[in-house]
Structure formats: C-alpha cells, structure tokens
C-alpha cells in the first residue's frame, strides 16, 4: 500500500520505533496521523509535531482501543493503516530457568504482545473490509522467529504475534486488506536500554529508530508480509528451519556466552 494520502494509526507511538514511524509516514505524504500511547503526554507531543491527533491508550483494554479508532474515524473518516506497535522490553535474563517468569509477567506479556494486536485489528477491520482496502502491521520481534535467550515469556508471546499475523493474512489477504509482521532485532530504543540518539553505525548490528521505521515503511509499500529490518535475520531463520537440532545447539552456545558475560553482537 502506498502511504501517500493514507490515514495511519500507530500504537506505542509516543517514543521509539512508533514515533519514528509516525514521522516517516508524514514524510511519505500520509494525510492523517493518529498517535496512541500509554503515555498521553508523549502521544500528544508527537501528534502536535506532526499535525495529527494524540491519544492516551492502554492497548490491553479493548474498549480503550475502540475509542482511539472511533476518534480517528471521527477526525479523518477512516483508518487505512494500522501499526500495532506497543510492546514490553525484555526483562532481566534468566539463563538457567526457562520458567522463572511469574504468572503475572506471563499474562502481561500475553496481553501486550498478542491480545493488544487482536483488540486493534478487531477495531479497524470492519471499516477496512467494508471499503475493501486497508493495511495491518503487527510489530513483533526477531525473537518471534528465533528466540530471546533467557526470556521465555517474551519469546513465546512474540511467536504468538507472528502466528496471529499469519492468520490475518490468510483470512483477509484476498479481501483487500494487506498484512505485514515486522520483526526487528537490535534497535536503539529505551526498551533495549539504548539511547534513541545513538548514531547510525556506532554499534554493530544496532539500527536507529529512523532506520527501522524506514525499513518498515518500505515493507508496507512493497506489500511484504515479513518485514525484516535486519536482513541477516532471514539467514538465521532459514538455518533454524533447515536443521533445528543444530540451531538449538547454537542457541545454547549463545546462552553460554551470555552467562560468561559476553555481549551478543550481530554483524551488520
């Protein structure tokens, strides 16, 4: 879908990749920008910068998500592109116990990384299907294709986000609604413990939010289901599929390196 002239709604857009996406959409000629974030002040600041509307929203609350979509439709008449981007960061890694996360942590990860996408898609799909046009983007993670060593709940729920996007593409891809799942790896955000002002290329394998947003926008305009901000992830994913046992052994070696205090670096 070409972004020019569209109305885009982005969740988790008060900062990070979400905010960078709003800026990227505006640069590409979007007619309307709807910024939703748990931090309403940040959402309003981004919206003011871009001439859009900013709304506070807890993406785990289905009624709140519907309210944001209703506000977008009241202002612009429709939502053409939904980027369901809100997410939680990886917790402190537990390299020895894959089941150490509390039930509350599991539920929170599930609510944000899976059900938030469900709530958002349910809210915008009726209008898209009625018009026979629209685009859904779930922002997951490379961990949804591979795994995040030491954080099982994060990995499992990001896999769930990928699976949901697959089901959406199967159900609606021939009804005028495009679907993508974005699976970024290392991006300089507060969620990954890095500063958004990190210069491009200053850390091996780490992208700026602007680079990630540009790659995601390119994927939307090229109607690509799987959007990889880090192309090397495709090779890792193919290696996993071709020899699962070998891949698991490699991930154990990654775990051992992390246990020894090594920083996992990805070649750009």
Regions picked out by a protein language model, each given a short descriptive name:
Residues 2-33:
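Canonical Rossmann dinucleotide-binding motif of NAD(H)/NADP(H)-dependent dehydrogenases/reductases
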Residues 28, 146, 167-177:
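Active-site-adjacent segment of SDR/Rossmann-fold oxidoreductases
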Residues 40-41, 57-68, 103:
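The beta1-alpha1 cofactor-binding region of Rossmann-like NAD(H)/NADP(H)-dependent oxidoreductases
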Residues 67-74, 93-100, 104-111:
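Active-site Tyr-X3-Lys motif and surrounding loop/helix of classical short-chain dehydrogenase/reductase
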Residues 88, 99-118, 133, 137, ...:
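Catalytic Tyr-X3-Lys loop
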Residues 121, 157:
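Active-site helix of classical SDR
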Residues 141:
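Residue(s) in the substrate-gating loop at a strand-loop-helix junction
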Residues 181, 197-236:
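C-terminal helical subdomain
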């Amino acid at each position: 879908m070409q972004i020019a002239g569209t109305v885009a709604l982005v969740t988790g857009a008060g900062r990070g990749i979400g905010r960078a996406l709003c800026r990227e959409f505006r640069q590409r000629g979007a007619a309307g920008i709807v910024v939703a974030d748990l931090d309403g002040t940040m959402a309003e600041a981004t919206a003011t910068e871009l001439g859009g509307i900013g709304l506070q929203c807890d993406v785990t609350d289905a009624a709140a998500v519907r309210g944001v979509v209703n506000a977008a439709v009241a202002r612009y008449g429709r939502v053409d592109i939904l980027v369901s981007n809100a997410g939680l960061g990886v917790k402190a890694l537990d390299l020895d116990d894959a089941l150490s996360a509390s039930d509350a942590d599991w539920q929170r990860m599930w609510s944000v990384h899976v059900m938030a996408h469900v709530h958002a898609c349910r809210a915008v799909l009726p209008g898209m299907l009625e018009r026979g046009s629209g685009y859904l983007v779930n922002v997951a993670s490379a961990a949804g294709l591979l795994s995040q060593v030491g954080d099982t709940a994060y990995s499992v729920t990001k896999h769930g986000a990928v699976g949901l996007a697959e089901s959406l593409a199967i159900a609606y891809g021939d009804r005028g609604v495009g679907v993508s799942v974005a699976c970024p790896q290392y991006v300089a955000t507060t969620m990954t413990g890095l500063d958004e002002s990190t210069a491009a290329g200053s850390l091996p394998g780490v992208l700026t939010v602007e680079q990630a947003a540009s790659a995601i926008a390119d994927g939307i305009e090229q109607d690509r289901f799987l959007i990889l901000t880090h192309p090397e992830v495709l090779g890792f994913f193919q290696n996993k599929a071709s020899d699962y046992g070998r891949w698991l052994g490699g991930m154990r070696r990654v775990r051992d390196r992390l246990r020894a205090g090594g920083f996992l670096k990805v070649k750009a």
